[in-house]
Amino acid sequence: VIRFENVSKRYDTGQEALSRVDFHIARGEMVFLTGHSGAGKSTLMKLIMLMERPSHGQVLVGGRQTNRIRGAGIAHFRRDIGVVFQNHQLLFDRSVFDNVALPLQVAGFQVGDIGRRVRAALDKVGLLHKERQNPITLSGGEQQRVGIARAVVNKPALVLADEPTGNLDPELSAEIMTLFRQFNELGTTLVIATHDIDLIGRMNKRVLSLANGRVTSGAAPGGSQ
């Protein structure tokens, strides 16, 4: 579902964030993306999301060449991707329900459909009973679960998670990873950027490692280079 072909990204400052990156992630995989701070993880995620463009090479997502997607097509492309952020990026002036409903409202869903989908997503993450609360009243782990519900409410084929457990203790981190595994078992492709080596080891999933803008291991499904 994701393929990078000889992808490099050089910023205007001269910094080369990625250099000749090649890898393939198959549909339905759950893959961890790891590497030191500044290794290129965030840049790689931004290229998948069309928040950045490669300086060289080709990025394919769902069989589509992203360099051909322009203008209004970008927003449509992003509807098929759920994103989970480390800092949640929730709106604290809206209820939990309204936060999770946002992607559906943007996509033009009917009110009845929105209600059903939001409540199903909140039920999956164990927060249906808090749909009317303000996110600021929730714990950090609960806020992250709201972020996950928002990411999956539109039933995307692909979910990207950038350091989703970065601010959580080990027990809460394990709970979040259990949620991700459950969504993966339903067929969702997941790419999770994380520094948590212990957590990765327990999950027994493929690891795509970056160092200084290059893929050092895990470039192909099955863990081979």
Located regions from the model:
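Catalytic Walker B motif of ABC-type/P-loop ATPase nucleotide-binding domains
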Residues: 159-162
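Conserved ABC transporter NBD signature motif
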Residues: 57-66
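Conserved signature/switch motifs of ABC ATPase nucleotide-binding domains
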Residues: 133-136, 154, 186
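ABC ATPase NBD coupling module
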Residues: 66-82, 111, 183-185
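Conserved ABC ATPase signature
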Residues: 134-138, 142-144
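Short coil-to-helix segment of the ABC ATPase nucleotide-binding domain corresponding to the Q-loop/switch region
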Residues: 94-101
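Helix-to-loop junction immediately C-terminal to a conserved catalytic motif
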Residues: 49
